[in-house]
């Protein structure tokens, strides 16, 4: 009798562990998304409550930073390789940081149900929390001769992040919300490169680009997937319609 009870308890333990392993990614991602939503709410409230003069100063400082990048020559490095922060990091981290905590704003990719805060930098710690803006690229406020780069991990067991970026197609839409401004980008180019081939992320004169970057292939991570969007007119209808479509391609309705 005791042996039967022991075997039964062992089966229950094994089943419990198995169920835990199966459910962990779903539960973990649910908790991650709740936390991300809370941060996004804080960012939106901060932008809504911002003093007009302070807001103007922040935007002008970001525009100045972007103008200097457009006229200079920056050598971009793989965002998924840890680099020692340079002397400009302090100034960079102070820009678009009204909500504190290093959050610039947030990105929405309705086609793949992604909504993530955008942090300054691409350190390992940052990319565990959400999307990271690649230092050395234009700040995500748009404008002529700008090219922002937003990075995110693929394949984390604790959160989805940019795992489904491979599902995007040319013509799909994504949206940036920064300092109360809303920017829309339509995917116009998708490419796969080696980590050292960062020249595709450079600024093009007169263009307003934002590129999303993640590792690929899934679980191997030897290459980088680049999903570039070109700025297009933002309307509330575009974002709302894209949100209704969910995982179906945004192209047919937006």
Task: Kindly give the residue locations of the regions a language model identified.
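Conserved small/polar residues in nucleotide/adenosyl-binding loops
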Residues: 248-254
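Solvent-exposed, non-transmembrane regions of membrane-associated and secreted proteins
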Residues: 4-247
């Amino acid at each position: 009798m005791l042996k039967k009870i022991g075997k039964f308890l062992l089966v229950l333990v094994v089943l419990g562990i198995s169920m835990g392993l199966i459910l962990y990614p779903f539960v973990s991602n649910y908790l991650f998304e709740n936390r991300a939503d809370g941060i996004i709410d804080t960012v939106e409230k901060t932008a809504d409550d911002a003093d007009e003069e302070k807001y103007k100063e922040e935007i002008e400082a970001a525009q100045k930073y972007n103008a200097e990048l457009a006229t200079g020559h920056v050598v971009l490095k793989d965002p998924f390789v840890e680099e020692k922060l340079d002397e400009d990091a302090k100034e960079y981290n102070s820009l678009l940081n009204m909500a504190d905590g290093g959050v610039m704003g947030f990105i929405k990719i309705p086609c793949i149900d992604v909504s993530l805060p955008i942090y300054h930098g691409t350190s390992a710690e940052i990319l565990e929390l959400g999307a990271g803006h690649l230092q050395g690229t234009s700040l995500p406020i748009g404008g002529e001769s700008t090219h922002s780069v937003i990075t995110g991990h693929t394949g984390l067991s604790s959160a989805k992040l940019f795992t489904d970026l491979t599902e995007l197609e040319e013509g799909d839409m994504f949206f940036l919300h920064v300092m109360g401004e809303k920017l829309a980008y339509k995917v116009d180019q998708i490419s796969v490169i080696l980590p050292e081939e960062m020249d595709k992320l450079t600024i093009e004169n007169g263009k307003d680009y934002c590129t999303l970057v993640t590792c690929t292939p899934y679980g191997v991570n030897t290459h980088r997937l680049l999903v570039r969007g070109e700025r297009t007119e933002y309307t509330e209808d575009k974002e709302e319609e894209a949100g209704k479509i969910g995982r179906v391609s945004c192209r047919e309705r937006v």
